């Protein structure tokens, strides 16, 4: 069954110890699901010993206990640096049982002690209000992967081993999870791994055959197809299949020895010879029954080996005495008296199977990455400043400027190998081409003549899968490193749900004192909604921000720097920060530059502010506030202000620019929120505010609805109008252009009288002229293309 | 190169015609990218003939033109019913060129006539403001798949062929797209296809080797691995590899004959013998150079066969005369004078290669699915009504009731086979088990003893991939059928981006008179945020609604029925509707029933209304409005009202329930929006409104910020607090529970005085009691579990 010549022998005695360890973990798992008392079954089981609400999942648990016990043996024997990723959902009972058995659980939670009293608490807390969930949740030591949402285990595992040459991640992939898209493409991660400078992932595809109520695809194709699939993905599969425990122990022990042997041999070869060409890494296919060792039948229906074992197999002991009897038989089938001493502690000869100290998978520092976090070395972002010869001078594209800053971050941290850039083939397209001056795209598939910036090692990872980019980066961050995900704004929605889960992970871990803070997850969304000139409607969606701000205020930050110097300041801040999700939206096309570096740093530190030089207010309140957030809205707002000041010189205008979107929220809602008095000082208590916003306009209303002056805030933003057209026409289609903004202001300012109405008429003429011009010429009018900021009043 | 014994011969003459057709399409493609005039090159090319803004994508185009020409020959020869799905992004020039050549384009757009004048317009409109995008956009006849966002071509194709036994979808899969997760798992769709009752998908994996700036993975693994991968996915690959046009024509023609032969033989066998066991369907791997036939070098850098050909190879003819020269040479290399007559019409002997009438891929009715749409036969939803013995009587779980209604829709439409249910293994979990009384899960992988509800044909498709469910359903709807996607609320975020694209597709097609309306995309989100008792925090996310309401108001509808009778009424409405996206959020757990069928139908028709029987107002305005939206918020609101009415009998309370969320928006913003006077009549102009909401609370503010009484609307909803706990405790953690709602009301009603304060103190005690009780018992207090509605005042 095992396809190898280099098999090793594991003694029968060791196999018996593994079996005992497995039984102990199974016992503790069933105990978690069922017992509120009588944890050692010192007396016959009574209904009072059983939890009133039976919640939890058994199906995947015995298989994961089996794997964990075998990994313990292998780690100890080979002194491996290994962590465990539990891909199948609902593996909670297994990882909790095992970290408890190895001692790492009680070290973190001393009240869950390794004795009868602690075991009782261990059982009671599981799936209990105020207790712990049934996944490999953040509360569980050794976990970097929750498993609540399926599909990301392999991506997280690869993220963990990049730049960790000694680390092996044992990644259990559920056969349900394997049907998801993200997992199906994650097998290709092996084309991005360097065997010399990265660690290894050992995938263990766990074919227990069923999901919630269905068989799984990979369990229902024949052996030949499954083997071809894994080989086609570039892996060497080792099959372990069956259900007889002792035969399976022998097969699994041998499979692991073969796999570890192959990993070591691949790594040794690459590291000694420098030959880093892509190896065929080993992986294990473990086919074992769902709900293995659980009840064979429940109420006359087959349970072990079917989807009926997915949750709680015997679900109604209160009403059905037969269930209670079966639960007791099931628990006693593990012969707990052989495994645990009378105080409930695992017998030493069994406990010795597991490694000790930080080699325990529940105590490995890589699984609590903040412990390993080293601050990034950062150049002074001010050194990359754009010279502002005059307000509004044309830059080279804001992200291109930041690209040089990031290039030097790459360079400065080359030694520690703890910074990476991820993107779906868009790092150049997003304007970060400068990084390729100092590094390459890491790529381990074939390289041919004429390829550019591809190499076996490099700081940039590009695969056309936003899921992979996100999953790799999350794994990289969770193991204590730093990184950046650059992505088209519209398509970052592809990872909405992954973002949700990571934000939830950060929220929960921030409340666990033993979890050290990790580096922030930084998104750079260049190629944004307003500049999809050649891509059109499908590439226009600024709604990721709406998804982000739904998450806990302590975790999420959103920045929309208006120019290159502001972007530098913001990126510097984000890359230094910890335990946030930072979303930065910035442009890549040549666009006006407004603030000197000093002004930008000050403006970004405040996150919001009045641009005195753009407005013309005196000491009293202005007549109108022109607010803007985002690079394109800032341009259109300043162009509108320029028109207003020229044509209505008596009007006093205040210009407010927003970089840190969270400043708009009340302080009670977000730590960055402005106090009401500060907000009122900026936006006035009663003047009209014409607000040009980068994203969907109602997001501003959602953030400001409690503010004094909210009824006077009028927001323009993207409203799902667009196609392939000119950059300026995109703003026209969404009423965000300078002409509309001027008209909006006049509509709110009846006191502008006849002059206002004449200016409005002029604006309408301009819009007609614009439409005619682009229809004839396919580009914007010269007065738009060549526009320069001036404040003539 | 072709792996088959049954090869056929295509005459050399035919191959030459195919080549001519291909050259014509290539000529028209390059023309679209470059030319504003001189479409037939009747004079030497001048810079004035070239567009000022050069936008578009060449890289994928010649390969797709190659495929389309070969498909034309095959369709005509075999009288195939075939449509074309363009998976690679930016195949716009190819599909536009080909539908123009075959005549379907000019039939829809008569001004783009098949002559020199029309050709000039065809060229000018491409990637031009007000023109057409560079994808296979909705504007292009024959398209059901835009391709702007990558990854869904195969899923759409399979959706199209379910229940269309005569249809073949030729699906071009880009090798960039093939890296995405959704595409990587979509290959497994063959495990769900019935060769007798469904049609066939012929995937053509187009390995042109490059993405935007990178090679692709599948082009850089060796032949053996690629073949293993495709075989592992269950396909039989046929390889066509090379770059010499005439050799490639011969190979491709033969490959298609083999593939079509295999498809027909598989279908014939299944249909004649009844053996529907899973066949190995054929697929084609076409390896050809990116930018094939384009310039070999540009500015000294290799272009054809590299990623440099991705967009516009010669990008600056205005400044670089050499570019202009090369453009002309490139265009003339296709020898247009051999292909087009002097009026610009394709010569008849070449045009004859293509099929005619509805066999043309641009005219096939399946690609304009509304043409084939047949109304669903619907039973009377009132027949499934829940008897309301008294207000608040406990139901069996709302979706379980609707399950029977849907079961009978399945039954009634069995004959026409135009209704399907899609879900990621959750149809039973979401409460729709009744459908398995009359149908099965369609499944074509192995079936073994003890399997339940699996069969080669069935109306339910379940794969653990939300992407697949969504993609299949979209393909099914786009080809003129009906369906339902049932999904856990939290995990529907996985398809946020697919929803975005489908909503955009619906918006654009609704503006094209020749595009017939299709059935709505219906989501049933059961297993919602408030009832994740055993799944916890990762399964709690009601934010899909925020994503949905960002899209065009004409397209999106959101319903939150409070009980089973309302759910029946809503589902009836949604399944009859066209060209919307309907999102329905409903519960599956036993919960109180409020409205008789008659009341429910009336309430849902209005979408919002006062529940007189719950409040106690007299003719004048009430003291407070207690509003609710969603089943759990409605329960907690009514429980709060019950407490308020008992303890503060002098208080007059109005209860408003919202089913149709869009009613909250102003009429100007959404067609369902209430007028301001109607809104004021419900919510008053100045009374406090305590609003209990299903999702994130700020969504209500976003919808109502323009309303008269907005400042008095106080919303409770999910605020990212939760874990494994009791159902009621979930509401407590988010301040949405009855006790908090009572306290909220009292806080806003100082006139309740000492009695109010005493009630508030009582509520605080209740919360303490609740916390203590669940900590001790792991379940809710009896007074919560056994609560029954009563209005004692």
From Swiss-Prot, chains A, B:
GO terms for biological process: carbohydrate metabolic process. Its EC number is 4.1.2.-. One of its GO terms (molecular function) is aldehyde-lyase activity. Its cofactor is thiamine diphosphate. Disulfide bonds: none annotated. Belongs to the XFP family. This is Probable phosphoketolase. It comes from Rhodopirellula baltica (strain DSM 10527 / NCIMB 13988 / SH1).
């Amino acid at each position: 069954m095992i396809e190898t010549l280099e098999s090793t022998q594991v003694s029968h005695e060791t196999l018996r110890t593994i079996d005992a360890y497995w039984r102990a973990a199974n016992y503790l798992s069933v105990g978690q699901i069922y017992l509120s008392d009588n944890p050692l079954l010192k007396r016959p089981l009574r209904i009072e010993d059983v939890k009133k609400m039976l919640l939890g999942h058994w199906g995947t648990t015995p298989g994961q206990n089996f794997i964990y016990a075998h990994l313990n043996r292998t780690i100890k024997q080979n002194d491996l640096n290994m962590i465990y990723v539990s891909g199948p959902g609902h593996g909670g009972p297994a990882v909790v049982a095992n970290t408890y058995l190895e001692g790492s659980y009680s070290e973190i939670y001393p009240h869950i002690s390794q004795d009868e009293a602690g075991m009782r608490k261990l059982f009671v807390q599981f799936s209990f209000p105020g207790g712990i969930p049934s996944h490999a949740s953040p509360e569980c030591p050794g976990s970097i992967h929750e498993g609540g949402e399926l599909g990301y285990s392999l991506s997280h595992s690869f993220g963990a081993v990049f730049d960790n040459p000694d680390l092996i991640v044992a990644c259990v992939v559920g056969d349900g999870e394997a049907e998801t898209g993200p997992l199906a493409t994650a097998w290709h991660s092996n084309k991005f791994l360097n065997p010399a400078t990265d660690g290894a992932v050992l995938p263990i595809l766990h074919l227990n055959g069923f999901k919630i109520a269905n068989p799984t695809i990979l369990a229902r194709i024949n052996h030949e197809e499954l083997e071809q699939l894994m080989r086609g993905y570039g892996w060497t599969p080792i099959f372990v299949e069956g259900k007889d425990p002792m035969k399976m122990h022998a097969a699994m022990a041998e499979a692991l020895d073969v796999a570890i042997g192959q990993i070591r041999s691949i790594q040794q070869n690459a590291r000694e010879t420098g030959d880093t060409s892509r190896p065929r890494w080993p992986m294990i296919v473990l086919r074992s029954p769902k709900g293995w060792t659980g009840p064979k039948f429940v109420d006359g229906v087959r349970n072990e080996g079917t989807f009926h074992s997915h949750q709680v197999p015997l679900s109604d002991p209160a009403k059905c005495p037969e269930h209670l009897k079966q639960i007791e038989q099931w628990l006693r089938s593990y012969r707990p008296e052989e495994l645990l001493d009378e105080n409930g502690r695992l017998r030493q000869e069994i406990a010795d199977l597991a490694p000790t100290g930080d080699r325990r998978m529940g105590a490995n520092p890589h699984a609590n990455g903040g412990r390993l976090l080293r601050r990034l070395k950062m150049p002074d972002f001010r050194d990359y400043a754009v010279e502002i010869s005059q307000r509004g001078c044309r830059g080279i594209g804001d992200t291109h400027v930041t690209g040089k800053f990031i290039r030097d971050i790459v360079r400065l941290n080359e030694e520690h190998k703890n910074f990476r850039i991820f993107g779906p083939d868009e790092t150049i397209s997003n304007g970060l081409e400068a990084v390729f001056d100092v590094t390459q795209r890491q790529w381990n598939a074939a390289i041919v003549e004429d390829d550019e910036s591809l190499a076996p090692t490099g700081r940039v990872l590009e695969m056309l899968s936003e899921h992979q980019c996100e999953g790799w980066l999350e794994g990289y961050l969770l193991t204590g490193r730093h990184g950046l995900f650059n992505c088209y704004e519209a398509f970052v929605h592809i990872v909405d749900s992954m973002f949700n889960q990571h934000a939830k992970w950060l929220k929960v871990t921030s409340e666990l004192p033993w979890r050290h803070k990790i580096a922030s997850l930084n998104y750079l969304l260049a190629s944004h909604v307003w500049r999809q000139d050649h891509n059109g409607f499908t590439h226009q969606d600024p709604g990721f921000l709406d998804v982000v701000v739904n998450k806990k205020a302590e975790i999420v930050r959103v920045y929309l720097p208006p120019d290159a110097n502001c972007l530098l300041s913001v990126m510097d801040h984000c890359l230094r920060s910890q335990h946030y999700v930072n979303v930065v939206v910035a442009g890549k096309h040549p666009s006006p530059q407004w603030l000197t570096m000093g002004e930008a740093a000050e403006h970004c530190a405040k996150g919001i502010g009045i641009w005195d030089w753009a407005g013309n207010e005196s000491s009293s309140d202005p007549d109108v506030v022109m607010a803007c957030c985002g690079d394109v809205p800032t341009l259109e707002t300043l162009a509108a202000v320029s028109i207003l000041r020229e044509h209505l010189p008596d009007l006093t205008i205040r210009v407010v620019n927003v970089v840190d979107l969270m400043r708009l929220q009340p302080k009670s809602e977000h730590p960055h929120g402005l106090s009401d008095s500060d907000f009122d000082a900026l936006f006035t208590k009663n003047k009209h505010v014409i607000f040009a916003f980068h994203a969907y306009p109602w997001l501003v209303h959602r953030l400001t609805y409690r503010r004094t002056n909210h009824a006077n805030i009028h927001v323009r933003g993207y409203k799902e109008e667009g196609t392939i057209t000119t950059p300026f026409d995109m703003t026209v289609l969404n009423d965000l252009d300078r002409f509309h903004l001027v008209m909006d202001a006049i509509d709110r300012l009846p006191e502008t009288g006849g002059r206002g109405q004449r200016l409005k008429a002029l604006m309408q003429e301009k819009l007609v002229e614009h439409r005619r011009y682009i229809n004839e010429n396919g580009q914007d009018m010269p007065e738009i293309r060549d526009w320069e900021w001036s404040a003539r009043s």
